């Protein structure tokens, strides 16, 4: 992609409903962070420039990010996470797995508490992808290892536990084991911050006494606050 093509896409994004400031893309094609940021916007459904987003995300894979700066580590991991998601949509599962692994490696390489990405969510992306690739047993083993490593740590809001138990709940639901699915989802919810205004909706969702586990989990998800908007300790 040329600088001219890059700047045309910047203005396309700036004219969209998102309306990001132009300085977000300072440095143009010479800046991996500018390329990653533009790619995120291009990948949005309302802009739908997935091919261009894919090209820009791929250009970031070999970026020389500064491991001492949390914002750079986070931005790099977030870009690889989104690239993996795009590749998963395209059925390119091996490439998607490689890139989510790279995102996890980057995020886990430091002790930073990130602002926008969650370590547990990165792992969940990997587990869901393994499940999609019929490697569910491998995913379950990793989930159990994460839960065992973190379940007794005195940390109240733990993304590893939330996403780990949630994954186990989804598997139980797919297998038709409703009570087990609900139990795991209770454990998942216990690992996250739940503002008071969400309590009634969650109680109602969990109170369902039928055997459609997938429906119950969908209702629980609807009643659960967006994890991106909550405080996490890890």
Regions found by a protein language model. Give the residues of each.
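Residue at a conserved register position within TPR or TPR-like alpha-solenoid repeats
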Residues: 42-44, 80, 87, 123, ...
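Alpha-helical segment of the N-proximal tetratricopeptide repeat
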Residues: 3-20, 29, 33-48
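Terminal, low-structured helical/coil segments at or just beyond the last alpha-helical repeat
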Residues: 197-234
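Flexible helix-coil transition and linker loops at the boundaries of alpha-helical arrays
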Residues: 19-30, 60-74, 105-119, 148-158, ...
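Structural motif corresponding to the intra-repeat A-B loop/turn of tetratricopeptide repeats
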Residues: 45-47, 90, 133, 168, ...
């Amino acid at each position: 992609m040329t600088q001219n093509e890059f700047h045309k896409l910047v203005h396309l994004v700036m004219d969209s409903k998102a309306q990001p400031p132009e300085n977000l893309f300072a440095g143009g094609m010479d800046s991996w962070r500018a390329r990653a940021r533009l790619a995120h916007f291009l990948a949005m459904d309302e802009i739908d420039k997935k091919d261009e987003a894919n090209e820009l995300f791929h250009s970031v894979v070999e970026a020389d990010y500064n491991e001492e700066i949390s914002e750079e580590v986070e931005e790099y991991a977030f870009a690889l996470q989104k690239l993996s998601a795009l590749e998963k949509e395209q059925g390119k599962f091996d490439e998607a797995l490689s890139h989510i692994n790279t995102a996890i490696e980057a995020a886990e390489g430091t002790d930073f508490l990130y602002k926008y990405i969650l370590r547990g969510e990165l792992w969940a992306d990997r587990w869901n992808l393994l499940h999609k690739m019929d490697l569910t047993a491998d995913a379950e083993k990793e989930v159990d290892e994460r839960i065992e490593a973190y379940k007794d740590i005195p940390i109240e809001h733990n993304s590893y536990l939330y996403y780990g138990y949630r994954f186990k709940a989804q598997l139980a639901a797919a297998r038709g084991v409703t009570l087990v699915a609900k139990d795991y989802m209770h454990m998942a919810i216990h690992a996250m911050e739940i503002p008071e205004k969400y309590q009634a909706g969650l109680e109602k969702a969990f109170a369902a006494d039928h055997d459609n586990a997938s429906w119950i989990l969908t209702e629980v998800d609807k009643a659960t606050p967006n994890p991106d908007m909550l405080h996490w300790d890890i």
